[in-house]
């Protein structure tokens, strides 16, 4: 079996940049790597992603949002992640079940036990061996995220979460930190507020160490 590594964090924390840099580094070292993301990662899940991240869908209820994430994840896990792991790939996933706990649980206030049940159902119990949490202050993350969005044409923007309140994003950040505190063996918190290269070194060092059994 391969190795399953996830990246988590608030909007603008730098995880998408760092996961791509890690993919490149591991590929150069000769590892077989698959980079994927949630929501999305396969055609059906990508269609659900378009619904979830469209700012025009502001009337979406928290429960509907949660169930859509679970549906996208169930398809993604069976179609993409499990086959790649069975093929001895290192699977790098930009967000996974922890994002649902942080955003829909701590951010939206939905019941954590219900979220846990849905995550279990959608993944058949699959959990990452390592989760990199890129942590940064909410103000820093949102400034980066909004700057990125403003550089994208209006019709291609995925901005429903970026437009949420600062309080919402603070709840999400706090949720992530609680998750990391509760599962110290799986989580690695990396400062996402530093420059890209410093963060890259911290991430690659940790991942190579984990792959080498350290």
Swiss-Prot record:
Q: Pfam family of this protein, just one?
A: Thymidylate_kin
Q: Which GO terms describe its molecular function?
A: ATP binding; dTMP kinase activity
Q: Which domain of life is it from?
A: Bacteria
Q: Which GO terms describe its cellular component?
A: cytosol
Reported EC number(s) for this entry are 2.7.4.9
**Is the Lyase keyword given for this protein?**
no
Q: Which UniProt keywords apply?
A: ATP-binding, Kinase, Nucleotide biosynthesis, Nucleotide-binding, Transferase
Name the reaction it catalyses: dTMP + ATP = dTDP + ADP
State the similarity comment.
Belongs to the thymidylate kinase family.
Listed name of the protein? Thymidylate kinase
